[in-house]
Swiss-Prot record:
Belongs to the TrpB family. Its EC number is 4.2.1.20. One of its GO terms (cellular component) is cytoplasm. This is Tryptophan synthase beta chain. The beta subunit is responsible for the synthesis of L-tryptophan from indole and L-serine. The keyword Metal-binding does not apply. Tetramer of two alpha and two beta chains. GO terms for molecular function: tryptophan synthase activity. Its cofactor is pyridoxal 5'-phosphate.
Length: 396
């Protein structure tokens, strides 16, 4: 029996080997206890404020919307210590690990941002850290690999399968199956077996809470829409959670359209996948005709994931949130627009959300609308990828 509901509608659950059930139960009990413990909450809040740098700014983009009637704000998770929203929930889970008496942390990472956040939290709190990362991602995210190693983490390249995030997830789970007595698996997104989707949402929900307070202070009303990119879905659910009951606020999640949905080279399981069991949960995923997990693709390593968190699947199924896709080229155009228009270098992941916001503005320039994009991370890690693409195009 679980203490919290393991499902969001029909999605979610706890589909793991029996050997891991006690570890998941211990984690759930520790989380429920910690949520009621003023000392834990005070320590978490202190770390978020004085170590990570919360609250993050809400920045008005004046140049990108020039000549239109839209007001576009960015929630600046890129300004957080570590460079992305990942730091929020990593600090929470690392504190939970200490609470459970664990001495080691296992993590998976795609773009490397979760790995960096995990490495910094482990260095801060005195925990051993090993991070599984697809061999392809190790190559395309070398700055983050070095950052992790600088902070004492062991980075383990995964060469199996497609050598990307899904394979890193599999290896991390395999490791945890043999080490759960001393190690905590610090999952990096709002997916996986219960209670992870709930824990990650709660440790990210300050994104939406701060956004709501800030936009009310600046504009005196709630936004017409909040937008966030969706891979596994943690930055998006962190933004959406506090707005779910505000039914007049549109929640828009942006999946990676890759080379175009029709090409098959994408990472958009919510709109173009089928429900199945993967990574310990029931959720939409990219599958072949015979039910095997299909390779996902995105220019952004952090969105290159063949499934999606179960709460997003539920919000999609009941029509509370809308999910769309943005191609690599559209994301790259938005990346360049923000660099040149506002002097902000965004992560390629976040650029997907920005691209859809810019589409909305272009489609109705005379419409008075108030939009907030969760700028989930900064683009330092992506500059070499973007450089190579722009060089091939002759743009630099």
């Amino acid at each position: 029996m679980t203490l919290l509901n393991p499902y969001f509608g029909e999605f979610g659950g706890q589909f793991v080997p029996q050997i891991l059930i006690p570890a998941l139960r211990q984690l759930e009990e520790a989380f429920v206890s910690a949520q009621k413990d003023p000392e834990f909450q005070a320590e978490f809040t202190d770390l978020l404020k004085n170590y990570a740098g919360r609250p993050t700014a809400l920045t008005l983009c004046k140049n990108l919307t020039a000549g239109t009637k839209t007001k576009l704000y960015l929630k600046r998770e890129d300004l957080l210590h570590g460079g992305a929203h990942k730091t929020n929930q990593v600090l929470g889970q690392a504190l939970l690990a200490k609470r459970m008496g664990k001495s080691e942390i296992i993590a998976e990472t795609g773009a490397g941002q979760h790995g960096v956040a995990t490495a910094l939290a482990c260095a801060l709190l005195g925990l051993k850290c090993r991070v599984y990362m697809g061999a392809k991602d190790v190559e395309r995210q070398s700055p983050n690999v070095f950052r992790m190693r600088l902070m004492g983490a062991e980075v383990i390249p995964v060469h199996s399968g497609s050598s990307t995030l899904k394979d890193a997830c599999n290896e991390a789970l395999r490791d945890w199956s043999g080490s759960y007595e001393t190690a905590h698996y610090l999952l990096g997104t709002a997916a996986g077996p219960h209670p992870y989707p709930t824990i990650v949402r709660e440790f990210q929900r300050m994104i939406g809470e701060e956004t709501k307070a800030q936009i009310l202070e600046k504009e005196g009303r709630l936004p017409d829409a909040v937008l966030a990119c969706v891979g596994g879905g943690s930055n998006a659910i962190g933004m959406f959670a506090d707005f779910i009951d505000d039914t007049h606020v549109r929640l828009i999640g942006i999946e990676p359209g890759g080379l175009g949905i029709e090409s098959g080279q994408h990472g958009a399981p919510l709109k173009h996948g089928r429900v199945g069991i993967y990574f310990g949960m029931k959720s939409p995923m990219m599958q072949t005709s015979d039910g095997q997990i299909e390779e996902s693709y995105s220019i952004s390593a952090g969105l290159d994931f063949p499934s999606v968190g179960p709460q997003h699947a539920y919000l999609n199924s009941i029509g509370r949130a809308d999910y769309v896709s943005i191609t690599d080229d559209e994301a790259l155009d938005a990346f360049k627009a923000l660099c040149r228009g506002e002097g902000i270098i965004p992560a390629l992941e976040s650029s997907h959300a920005l691209a859809h916001a810019l589409k909305m503005i272009k489609a109705e320039p005379e419409k008075e609308q108030l939009l907030v994009v969760n700028l989930s991370g900064r683009g330092d890690k992506d500059i070499f990828t973007v450089h190579d693409i722009l060089k091939d195009r002759g743009e630099i």
